Design a protein with these regions (language model features):
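Helix-loop junctions on the cytosolic side of multi-pass membrane transporters
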Residues: 169-171, 178-206, 405-417
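Hydrophobic core of transmembrane alpha-helices in multi-pass small-molecule transporters
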Residues: 15, 83, 94-110, 321-336
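Juxtamembrane intracellular "pre-TM" segments in multi-pass secondary transporters
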Residues: 1-5, 193-233
Length: 418
């Protein structure tokens, strides 16, 4: 198989996967409310959902490394189907919470599986393309998948395409489509990401019998490696900043629109533009990397410091137009180094613990996000959203300096870091 064929297969699979995820994004909170949940109960459900993912992230990453990444991914699809089916029948808080646990577990099972699979397959194929450029193409497809899924997910409840007497709300059609699409993706993935390909091309590695041992080994490496340590530390802060901005931009914009006769379509438009901006950032990251002579650490450092400066500006906006421009510019700069950070992480990790390391990275984002939801939410309530964003900007700028600690020779494009 050629590099181009592998990229095409994986990008298509990821676009399909994330389009299914996008189906629930526009209506998730509305769906919970139709189950009789108030905002406090919804907060409990979301904390349980995220907490389940965080708790299972690392051990299930070790499971994928030991028992097969493609098989583990398929298990995540089955768990998604089960969780969505239970949510379809849930009529009280307890059943919704159980469904949230299943869906959180599905996210944890998925974390790092196919990403690690693709990296190993890509490195085993000779070709001129770099992993960074391949990742940029894939992330563009992921973004378009999310955008398409979100658009369809927002349209489905009003479409009236399907309605059964046992359905509890108009939003249940989204769950039906998620279940159907996940079953279809199970079948399609057998062709796009075959287990046989992994068996033929992957190098056999000694595998410890104890999953906890695998997790401890990966954790130890992540906090002692000259590249992985700053990457993980900054990833924690990245999760905090991302959560702070995503949780607070809607109420901030609502205040700006309070004197205007604007509907919710403004929020939808800005969200759609955000997806397009993220795709543009991923595409341009390859060219921008060449400006830094292939140094991933410098690309990340400069783009994150610049995004921190823009976040300060976002806290000062007072008009819709200025808010939209600065908000989109922030996310363009904030995501510009995402591919480079993934390269540093992947290249620094031994193949036999790659899924585990990706799960640890995802865990850092989750933990940072959970902490930010509580801490920055409190600050926003008592001191204002602008203050929260300014503090987040300071944290982002300070943590970005950690990339300067990475040895220059280990942050070059195409350099093996293991």
């Amino acid at each position: 198989m050629t590099q181009s064929a592998l990229i095409y297969r994986f990008a298509t699979q990821q676009a399909l996967h994330w389009s299914i995820t996008g189906l629930i994004v526009p209506v998730l909170i509305l769906l919970f409310q139709t189950r009789g949940l108030n905002l406090t109960e919804i907060g409990i459900v979301m904390a349980l959902w995220i907490g389940t993912t965080a708790l299972l992230e690392v051990p299930l990453g070790s499971f994928a490394d030991q028992f097969g990444r493609v098989r583990t991914y398929r298990l995540s699809l089955l768990m998604t189907i089960l969780g969505a089916a239970l949510m379809l029948q849930a009529s009280n808080l307890i059943l919704v919470m159980v469904s949230a646990v299943l869906l959180g577990a599905a996210r944890a099972i998925y974390s790092g599986t196919l990403d690690a699979w693709f990296y190993d397959q890509f490195q085993s194929i000779e070709g001129e393309a770099s992993y960074h450029s391949a990742l940029a193409k894939i992330n563009i497809m992921v973004t378009f998948g999310l955008a398409l899924g979100s658009l369809i997910g927002g349209w489905l409840p009003d479409s009236g395409l399907v309605h059964f007497s046992w359905m509890q709300s108009i939003y249940d059609i989204n769950l039906l489509v998620i279940i159907t699409a996940s079953i279809a993706l199970l079948i399609v993935t057998q062709w796009l990401v075959p287990i046989e390909l992994s068996k033929v091309q992957s190098k056999p590695e000694p595998r410890p019998s104890n999953l906890l041992t695998k997790g401890r080994q990966a954790l130890r490496l992540s906090w002692h490696h000259s590249v992985l340590k700053p990457v993980m530390q900054t990833t924690l802060v990245l999760g905090m900043v991302l959560s702070c901005v995503e949780n607070l931009w809607q109420p901030y914009l609502s205040e700006l629109l309070s004197e205007r006769d604007s509907g919710t379509q403004v929020f939808g438009l800005i969200s759609a533009l955000y997806f397009l901006m993220a795709a543009q950032s991923s595409w341009l990251s390859v060219r921008v990397l060449s400006w830094f002579s292939g140094s991933h650490r410098m690309l990340i450092l400069v783009s994150r410091v610049a995004s921190a400066g823009v976040l300060f500006g976002l806290a000062l906006t007072t008009q819709l137009e200025s808010f939209a421009i600065v908000y989109l510019l922030f996310f363009f700069l904030f995501t510009l180094g995402e591919n480079s950070q993934s390269v540093l992480l992947q290249d620094s990790t031994p193949s036999d613990m790659r899924s585990t390391m990706l799960s640890i990275s995802s865990l850092m984002v989750t933990v940072g996000g959970m902490g930010a939801s509580l801490g920055f939410g409190y600050l926003a309530d008592h001191f204002g959203i602008g203050v929260s964003w300014c503090i987040a900007a300071i944290l982002l700028m300070a943590s970005s300096m950690l990339f300067a600690l990475i040895p220059a020779e280990k942050a070059k494009r195409g350099h093996s870091l293991v």
